[in-house]
Amino acid sequence: MSWQQRVDDALTARRATDTLRRRYVVSQGAGRWLVANGRQYLNFSSNDYLGLSQHPQIIRAWQQAAIRFGVGSGGSGHISGYSVAHQALEEELAQWLGYPRALLFISGFAANQAVITALMKKNDRIVADRLSHASLLEAANLSPAQLRRFIHNDTQHLSRLLQSPCVGQQLVVTEGVYSMDGDSAPLAEIQHIARRHHAWLLVDDAHGIGVTGDEGRGTCWQRGVKPELLVVTFGKGFGVSGAAVLCSESVADYLLQFARHLVYSTSMPPAQAQALSASLAVIRSDEGRERREKLAALVQRFRAGVNASRFTLLNAHSAIQPLIVGDNSRALRLAEALRQQGCWATAIRPPTVPVGTARLRLTLTQAHEACDIDRLLEVLHGAGE
């Protein structure tokens, strides 16, 4: 088979199963409204849960830092790219979340891959929730360690897998809030099981940090859990981008030596780090609390309305509210029907989610108003098959 044939066959297979991904060009993709092709839509696809991507205080912090530092960091943090803005943000994050150290990464994908590939060795075992993010599972597959996957949120299955003999070390991997299902992991029980088997715990709290817990400290803080490795990302609740790993002093020093994604990548711009510090300040303030409370009320309003209709929701009380459709083509038709009525929603299909669970992944944000939720419910009820 030639290179071209391989490429063509892969694309043909995606088209045949209605799983071909497409990008849409938008003029504005975050906030209450999405603008595309000159038309304005209510935006139910953004991960900007607290509406901070448009916050004037955060925008101003980025602008002022760009004037001071320029628009790029100039290199890896190991060369010349670790500025006072990066250092300040790491210290603020560590203090906020109660860890000795925080290390910044350019993305959550990079952070997850860096930690797993740097730590895991031959004869080690990774035990991951089967619905863990692609960055976690890909890192596990690329590492020399054995990967075992436990049934989603099934702590008994997790315990059985950890009980089987392992020559090396074991790492349990889960998420705080699951990106496609919107539900939460039983973190306290998972941590108890991991410690009983002398395993370390890695929690990716991309969709919980900033949005849940006291001062927005996330799902782990809310559940009284402190994993050995906590990954937080900044493209959701923080409204910016990037990520950080929270850990001990020795693990941070180890990652600075052996995490290739950290050593060999240009660090985030200092202006971005300063904007993230400004975002953190908002998240921790009374304004941040009010934004979280408003979002929680909108989620409750949506779930109450959908539960009275023909749609069935998953047990998700986060900003992520998936409507399981099942069939790929039906999910695409439903997304298009909503767009025709001025609501932008995204159809999520395999391989992002398991076969037979195609869905609309609806996301609610603090930028929405109650009337927006009511409009979405009205359109959904009219579009339901």
UniProtKB/Swiss-Prot annotation:
Residues annotated for substrate binding in this entry: R21, H133, T352
Q: Where does pyridoxal 5'-phosphate bind?
A: G108, F109, S179, H207, T233
Top enzyme class, one word, equals transferase
GO MF annotation, one = 8-amino-7-oxononanoate synthase activity
Keywords, ordered alphabetically = Biotin biosynthesis, Pyridoxal phosphate, Transferase
Sequence similarity: Belongs to the class-II pyridoxal-phosphate-dependent aminotransferase family. BioF subfamily.
Q: What role does this protein play?
A: Catalyzes the decarboxylative condensation of pimeloyl-[acyl-carrier protein] and L-alanine to produce 8-amino-7-oxononanoate (AON), [acyl-carrier protein], and carbon dioxide.
Annotated protein name in UniProt: 8-amino-7-oxononanoate synthase
What is the scientific name of the source organism?
A: Salmonella paratyphi A (strain AKU_12601)
